[in-house]
Structure formats: C-alpha cells, structure tokens
From Swiss-Prot:
GO terms for cellular component: cytoplasm. The lineage of its organism: Bacteria, Pseudomonadati, Pseudomonadota, Alphaproteobacteria, Hyphomicrobiales. This is Elongation factor G. Residues 8-283 form the tr-type G domain. Gene3D superfamilies: 3.30.230.10, 3.30.70.240, Elongation Factor G (Translational Gtpase), domain 3 (3.30.70.870), P-loop containing nucleotide triphosphate hydrolases (3.40.50.300), Translation factors (2.40.30.10). Catalyzes the GTP-dependent ribosomal translocation step during translation elongation. During this step, the ribosome changes from the pre-translocational (PRE) to the post-translocational (POST) state as the newly formed A-site-bound peptidyl-tRNA and P-site-bound deacylated tRNA move to the P and E sites, respectively. Catalyzes the coordinated movement of the two tRNA molecules, the mRNA and conformational changes in the ribosome. Belongs to the TRAFAC class translation factor GTPase superfamily. Classic translation factor GTPase family. EF-G/EF-2 subfamily.
Length: 690
C-alpha cells in the first residue's frame, strides 16, 4: 500500500506543560476538532481520552505518554501526550526524544511555572522547535502580557505574540490574528466548533498594530531581502510572514505565542493551524545519527528509500494485546511479518501486529513509513531506548540517558501466589520505565523498588495492586545514599592459602583515589612485566566490583572511585582468577577504609511558591530540614523560594506545607546532586544500616 501522506505533511509533536496548565484538555480538544474523538472528555471528571490508565483518571494527571494520530487540513498529526508532573520527567524526556516539535501550554493566570521551566530546559537539550499556547484566558487573573514577560524572565527565551486576546477572564471572546490582521470570534452555542473572522475591534486596533510591528521586525531579521524590503516601507505578505515565522521556530530564533481557552473551546483551531504552519516535518529537523557495527557514525535521513531504522521509546502492557512497544520510524519502510534486528541487544525480532494508536482504540496496519509513530505488539526483547533496524544495515541510534533513582521502598508479598505475580509484574514495569529499578537486598532478601520520587513509587505500587492484583506490604521510603573515598590510598594485599594440595595465592597492589564527581568507577591496569598475568585481570576487576555495591561506611554503593592496579605477584600452580578475585576484594575494602570513605546523601532542588503571609514559616521550616535557601523572588503576588534540601528531610513535606499554608503553597523538587552527609547524619545512618 503506497504512502498516503507525503512525509513533508507529517507533524510529530508533543504538548508539554506544568501540571494543571490544561495540557490534557488542549489535547482532548485537538482530538475533538480533528474528528478523532466524538465526545469531549473533561479531566476534572476523570474521562479524558488520552488519560487512559485508571491511576491517571483518578488523580487527574497524565502519567504515560500515549501516542495518537489525527488529521488537520490534509496534514497528518502524530501527537505524543507528555506528563507534566516532576516525578515523570523521564517520560517527558523520552517523548521529546522522538518529537520534531512541541506546543508549550501555559496557564495564563500562572505564567511560567516550575515544571514549565523543567520541560522547557529538556526541550532545549533536545533542540525541539516550540510554539507557546497561553491557555485558560477565561480564568480569573488571566494575563497574556505577563506570560510574554515570564517567558523572557524565567526561560530566557524570546517570545513573539502572533495573536492577541480579545478580552480576558469572563469577557474572553476570541483573538486577534496578527498575521492576517483579523479578529477571530467563537460562537459559544456550537461548543466552539463555529467561529468567524471579523474586523478588529476599534479599541484594540492600536495595540494590534503595535504588536504586529514587533512580530514583523522579529521575523524579517531572519531574511536579508525581507529586511531590505521592510526598511523600504514594504510589509511582507502573509505567505512570506508565515515562511519567516516558520524559519524562526526551526532555528529557535524566537517562539510564537498564541492564546485561547481549551476548556471553553476557543483558540484550538488556530493552534492547529499554527502546528501545521510553523512546526517542523520530519525532513525539517536534522537527520538522526547512529553508530554502525564498526563503530562509525552514520546518518539516517527521514526517507522511505533509506535502510530501516526505528527507536522504541515507550513500552506498555495492554490488557488486550499484551506488550505494546511504541516506536518512531526514522527511516525506511516497516512491514508486518518482516524480520528486524534489535541492534542494541543484538537480538532478532519478527514484526507481528502493527497498530496505529488513537488514545484508547487502535487500528491494525500492514505497513508504516519514515516519520510514522507506530505501536508494535508482541516484541520479546525490546526495551525503552532500543534501536530496531534492517538486519543487512545494522545501526544503533543515539542512546537515551536516564537519571539514577533517588528514593526506594521495600515491598513484601503477602503470600507465595503474590510472590509469583510480583516477579512478573515488576519485570514488566521495569521494562516500561527505565527510571524505575528493581533489586533484591542481599542480606534481608527483600525486594527493593527504586524511583524518582514519592509519587512515582506510589503510582507503581498502585499499578501492582490494581492491574496485577498483587497483595503486598510496603515499607517506608528510604533514601538512596552513596559512599565515596575522600583521599588517595595505597594498599598491598596477599591472599595465601597453601595447606597441602592445590592452594590459593594472589598478591595485588592498588592505588585507589577519588574520581571526578559523576565520573563513576574506573579501573586501570598499569601492571608491567607480567607480575599479574593477563588472564587474571578479569578476576581482579570482579573482586573490586563485588565491593562497589556495598561500601564500608554503611553498606551503600561506592561511587566516583578510580582504582589502579600497579603491581602484584602470582604462583605458577596456586594462582587462579578466583584467588585474584578474593585478594582484590579484601584489598579494595582495606583501601576504602584507608581512603576515609564518607556517606553521600541526595540533595534536592526545591522550589516553594507561597503567598507572602507564609514566607517566614516556609523558610523557617526549610531551614529546620537542613535546607539552604538559594534565593527568593516574586511571581505575581506570590513568593518563590529556591532551596537545596537533603532528600531524607523531605519525606511527607507535601502535607506539612499544606497545613502550614492552609493549602495555598505548592512545591516541586527534583534531584540535583550528591553531597557529603554531616557527621551526625552519617552516624545515625551507620547505626541504622551498618
């Protein structure tokens, strides 16, 4: 079956925002107006089409990014819904990785909020072209112009209004399209499906002219001919203006800002037009790079004639179809029934069912092309971030990087049957979400779940209980401490066990020193003259690595350490890889003692937004949690407090903050860095764990 839509007519985009900015409602309206959804789902009634997991429906927040295909003005839109809660930033990163463009939704009353900054920075990291939609213009306190200023002050970006609101709060009627210089007004009776172009109201004409001039000046800067014509008094026509704005979006020169109220069905159709006019198609963004089997860099262009390459960006367990792997096809054509290779894991796979997903229903397809986002059922080996490709032309596309989890809880199944269900469920959850890790505590035998925050783990436990029907006891959350040495240590160690028969003998000399923060563990062998034969070096490494997971301070993983093997001795008969493993283990433990190992604790970047009346209490409380206040500024009439606080002192903070501020203050936190724990904290932790 030949391609229906040219690749130039694709728009793969996501909608990113702070929690509660109206992202899901905006997506819902897009699906409604593009004819994919027959009933509008309201988030506050828990029925939105995109929010399809039971946990999301209950909490009213979007957790998993579902991919949806819709059509507008002959263009094919693939929409990735991204979560807005800080515990799910991994999902946001993952969807930004496979998008070509994004719509950043702001709450016009709040402007740029903490999580908006986080997702914006992630967008910068992946260089995602963006347009901005100032939503909730009907809300009390909505201020479009404050949003523009916020984008400058808080994101350091250049906003350019391409629309202006007509009225605000209860009087929000529609908008002025500055590109066409027309007013667009919505008919309330038709659920916003009907709107009409009219002349710009007299009282707003001057303002419209002023902002149109600003828009044109920003646009013509990108084109010498247009600039010369403009300086001669010739304004660019509509087509030229759109071309220049599109160029600005693709280069990140400025960000067009639109306005509307998704909930009141105003401004959604012009937003869709802007997606088509200004966001890139797969051929407008740089071609994806990868590594071939010889380690050379190769490029895969967005073209059906290129060798097949696709990236798995999301894995979900579907009750009807089984495991579904969402993939972005970067190049080539994918047909069901063909064999592909998972180059990341060097495993072969056969493509079975191929599905086009609409938020909650699916359409079987036989063929998909470059630029498509498809769901594949029944892949056995694929994990998030894996590359699937043509076996004749293997390539590994850029890897996704996932942050280390900072919080953990123990989970104990109540019965043997639960134990079996838990094993299956955890394997599936870990495959779906790389920021969620599962391990077993060697000493206690407990299963440990690790994640990015309390909410992240709460949701996982909820899924275990609801979806997989696992009955289990959950322990209190624990902090993921680390250990590192603080000074260089030199050790010589001999392991000797020679009492008749084949004995054991190995001697090693190490220099162990702190590595750069974040550099991790590094092993270097500087042995000369065969004092430790080559075949025993893996034994040496194995011995060191067996200690890395459990340091000498309180049994936590050791990080940022460099171990150099400088010398050693061996015996022709009694030496073995095992003997060197035992010697290295003991030598490394001794070095950790000598090198003055210390305990590291995760420090979180906390931002509290509070009415001025409670500022004193909030700061006092953060100080009592060993927080270091980094600074304060005003946002509207609220005070924003930035602080660095140890994670161990942030448990249950949400309830404290609520009661302290009568529910009016909010906070967000994310992992920032590891720092040495004070002596009293270290002693307390040692007493508890060592």
């Amino acid at each position: 079956m030949p391609r229906v839509h040219a690749i130039e007519d694709y728009r793969n985009f996501g909608i990113m925002a702070h929690i509660d900015a109206g992202k899901t409602t905006t997506t819902e309206r897009i699906l409604f107006y593009t004819g994919k959804s027959h009933k509008i789902g309201e988030v506050h009634e828990g029925a939105a089409t995109m929010d399809w997991m039971a946990q999301e429906q209950e909490r009213g927040i979007t957790i998993t990014s579902a991919a949806t295909t819709a059509f507008w003005n002959g263009k094919r839109l693939n929409i990735i819904d991204t979560p807005g809660h800080v515990d799910f930033t991994i999902e946001v990163e993952r969807s930004l990785r496979v998008l070509d463009g994004a719509v950043c939704v702001l709450d016009s009353n709040q402007g740029v909020e903490p999580q908006t900054e986080t997702v914006w920075r992630q967008g910068d990291k992946y260089r995602v072209p963006r347009i901005v939609f100032a939503n909730k213009m009907d809300k009390t306190g909505a201020d479009f112009f404050k949003c523009l200023q916020d984008i400058v002050d808080r994101l350091g970006a250049k906003p350019v209004a391409i629309q202006l609101p007509i009225g605000s709060e209860n009087n929000f009627k529609g908008l002025i399209d500055l590109v066409r210089m027309k007013a667009v007004v919505w008919n309330d009776e038709s659920l916003g499906a009907k709107f009409e172009d009219t002349d710009i109201p007299e009282d707003l004409l001057e303002q419209a002219k002023e902002y149109r001039e600003k828009m044109i000046e920003a646009a013509v800067e990108l084109d010498d001919d247009a600039m010369a014509a403009y300086l001669d008094g010739k304004e660019p026509d509509e087509a030229t203006l759109k071309r220049l704005i599109r160029k600005a979006v693709l280069n990140g020169a400025f960000y067009p800002v639109l306005c509307g109220s998704a909930f009141k069905n105003k401004g959604v159709q012009p937003l869709l037009d802007a997606v088509v006019d200004y966001l890139p198609s797969p051929v407008d963004v740089p071609a994806i790079k990868g590594i071939d089997e010889d380690g050379n860099e190769v490029v895969r262009k967005a073209d059906d004639s290129e060798p097949l390459a696709l990236l798995a960006f999301k894995i979900m367990d579907d009750p009807f179809v089984g495991t579904i792997t969402f993939c972005r096809i970067y190049s080539g054509v994918l047909q069901s029934g063909t064999g592909v290779v998972n180059s990341t894991r060097e495993k072969k796979e056969r493509i079975g069912r191929m599905l086009l997903m609409h938020a909650n229903n699916r359409e079987d397809i036989k063929e998909a092309y470059a630029g498509d986002i498809v769901a594949l059922a029944g892949l056995k080996e694929a994990r998030t971030g894996d590359t699937l490709c043509d076996p004749a032309k293997p390539v590994i596309l850029e890897k996704m990087e996932f942050p280390e989890p900072v919080i953990e809880i123990a989970i104990e199944p109540k019965s043997k049957a639960d134990q079996e269900k838990l094993g299956v469920a955890l394997a599936k959850l870990a495959a779906e979400d790389p920021s969620f890790r599962v391990s077993t505590d060697i000493e206690s035998g407990q299963t440990i779940l690790k994640g990015m925050g309390e909410l992240h783990l709460d949701i996982k436990v909820d899924i275990l209980k609801r979806t997989y029907k696992v009955d289990a006891n959950i322990g209190a959350p624990q902090v993921a401490f680390r250990e590192r040495i603080t000074k260089k240590a030199e050790v010589d160690y001999t392991h000797k066990k020679q009492t008749g028969g084949t004995g054991q003998f190995a001697a090693v000399s190490f220099i162990v020193e702190p590595n750069e923060p974040g550099a991790g563990y590094e092993f270097i062998s500087k042995v000369v003259g065969g004092s430790v034969p080559k075949e025993y070096i893996p034994g040496v490494e194995k011995g060191i690595e067996s200690v890395l997971g459990s340091g000498v301070v309180a049994g936590f993983p050791v990080v940022d350490v460099k171990v150099t093997l400088v010398d050693g001795k061996y015996h022709d008969v009694d030496s073995s890889a095992l003997a060197f493993e035992i010697a290295s283990r003991a030598a490394f433990r001794e070095a950790l003692q000598k090198g003055k190992s210390v305990l590291l604790e995760p420090i979180m970047k906390v931002e509290c937004v509070t009415p001025e009346d409670y500022t004193g209490s909030v700061i006092g409380d953060l100080n009592s949690r060993r927080g270091q206040i980094q600074g304060q500024d005003m946002r509207g009439n609220a005070n924003v407090i930035n602080a660095m606080v140890p994670l161990m002192n942030m448990f249950g903070y949400v309830n404290n903050l609520r009661s302290m501020s009568q529910g009016r203050a909010t906070f967000t936190m994310q992992f920032d860095h590891y720092a040495e724990a004070p002596a009293n904290v270290s002693a307390e932790v040692q007493k508890k764990f060592a």
